[in-house]
């Protein structure tokens, strides 16, 4: 489910436009929501990590190598090389917070379930329950794999060395 993009366990950041539409970064795309309804998706121009923000109703997307400036529909207006990755690093640092019209929005995690909360306490987005269940399932699987690996290492170390002793006749 994760490989197909149907379940998302982490986000690449978020931003809002002047109409308070939510832009939520996922794997290789930015989904645009209006009041919890998905409107459309914008291509992130990479299948790897990226960072983005919205300034003056334009999306700035940094792939650490290239910066794309797009309109709110995702049409590329301009692009340039980010040779020192400074914009990428700055956007990554600020990916869990966004300010618009004097209000601050923050990405919070409640037991691993992401949600975006306005400074007045209003939740404007929460990770879907299916995605959260998949995320918990992955964490439990990883924990079981670690326990299994430790068990196997311990059990192989405890095996006695069996050596053949010949009796002299």
Indicate residue ranges for each PLM-predicted region:
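Eukaryotic scaffold repeat domains enriched in small/polar residues
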Residues: 1-169
């Amino acid at each position: 489910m994760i490989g197909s993009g149907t379940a998302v366990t982490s986000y690449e950041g978020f931003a809002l436009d002047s109409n308070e539409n939510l832009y939520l970064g996922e794997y290789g795309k930015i989904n645009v929501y209006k009041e919890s309804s998905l409107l459309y998706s914008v291509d992130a121009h990479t299948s790897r990590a990226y960072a983005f923000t919205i300034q003056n109703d334009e999306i700035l997307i940094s792939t650490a190598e290239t910066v794309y400036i797009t309109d709110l529909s995702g049409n590329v207006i301009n692009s340039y090389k980010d040779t020192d990755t400074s914009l990428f690093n700055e956007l990554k640092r600020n990916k869990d917070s966004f300010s618009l019209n004097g209000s601050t929005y923050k990405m919070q995690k409640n037991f691993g379930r992401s949600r975006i909360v306005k400074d007045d306490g209003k939740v404007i987005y929460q990770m879907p329950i299916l995605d959260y269940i998949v995320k918990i399932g992955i964490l439990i699987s990883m924990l079981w794999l670690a326990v299994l690996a430790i068990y196997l290492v311990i059990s192989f170390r405890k095996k006695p060395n069996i050596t053949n002793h010949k009796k002299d006749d």
